[in-house]
Amino acid sequence: MSAEKKTERLFSLDLLRGLDMVLLAVIGPLVRGADQAWGLPKPVMAQFRHAWAGFSLWDIIMPMFIFMCGAAIPLALERRMRDGRPTGAFWRHVAWRFALLWVLGMMAQGRILTLDPMQISPYNNTLQTIAAGYLITALLMLTRSRIVLIAAPILLFAGYGILLACFGDYTETGNFAYLAEMAVLKRIVPEGSKAFQVGGYTWFLTTMMFGFMSLCGFHCTAIIRSALDTRRKTAALLALGGGLLGLGWLLALRVPVIKPIFTVSFTAQAMGWCVLAWTVLYLITDVCRLRRGLSVVILYGQFALTAYLCHTVFHPAVNRTAEILAQGLPRIFGETAQPFTLACVAGLVITGIVWVRSRMKNETIREQGMGNGGQEEGNGRDGARPSQPSTVDA
């Protein structure tokens, strides 16, 4: 691998990750606060909720995180391989990332901190889906066969679709993914456990789709880093994104678009939008180098895991801090606006925490660079860092 590829930076990947995180942790709460304060039109609020069937803006958040995980994997792991073979550093990195994301997922949503076997859910969070997709993609990355790499996502996608089509139906408790979920849970958690309350979401069998989505991101990175010129790279990405989107729309004629179980019609549409969104940002920021005014979003992209944990595990603490800081604001903006005001302050609190985290990270990098005689590479003037260090996905 050339030195150029080793130091390649993808500003657009951090930007897309940041936009996804800002939507989840800042924009969503702001919209709900505005709705609580003044009431927003139902069509607007429908875009910020998960329905059983259909596709909303809110539905794209989780698939996009999994997609970006796969996109970042080659950037993080290829430098831990030697002549295409994994080193000890490769396996340590994969094991650490998988374990970290899995445990943090159980902290965020699996209630592991209760230490109550009747409360704990072993597998029910976005971070764990990222870990699952990460492991599948990392292992497939070891193959030297391009045919296997191309066939794997197709087989995962088709296999999952066939299973759901041939067994069960597409109702909340009658689909095959749900039946498989219950069968697995009965064998690993106590009877009567809260883990059985899945709210229609499925995880174990649906891991096939998490692998598919991660591999979609992996192949997009392969296209971007290929020897093709920019025009052909763009054409390939647009063809892939448009093809996936069209496939999703076509499948929707027979297969319901259902996010909680990631039906093939939903997943193909989600991946189509992810590929197209990244293509646009790649052209704007990595090709045309238009990057001004994006520092806050990039901050969220580079420290997405910190922002995510603030939004989930430490959500009560963030909200309480916002309440303390905003307690006098009703005198200025009125009581009616307080839900929206609290959401604004909570967003500022999360942004402040992420900024502090970035300063700590940059200081650590600077000290390491000084310890290495100033040879350690730092941040560029445009604020971009290599995409792979983001804890949430690589």
Language-model-derived ranges and their functions:
Residues 1-367, 393-394:
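Alpha-helical transmembrane segments and their immediate juxtamembrane cytosolic regions
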Residues 372, 379-382, 393:
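Acidic/polar hotspots within intrinsically disordered regions
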Residues 383-389:
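Short, low-complexity intrinsically disordered segments enriched in A/P/G/S/L with frequent Arg
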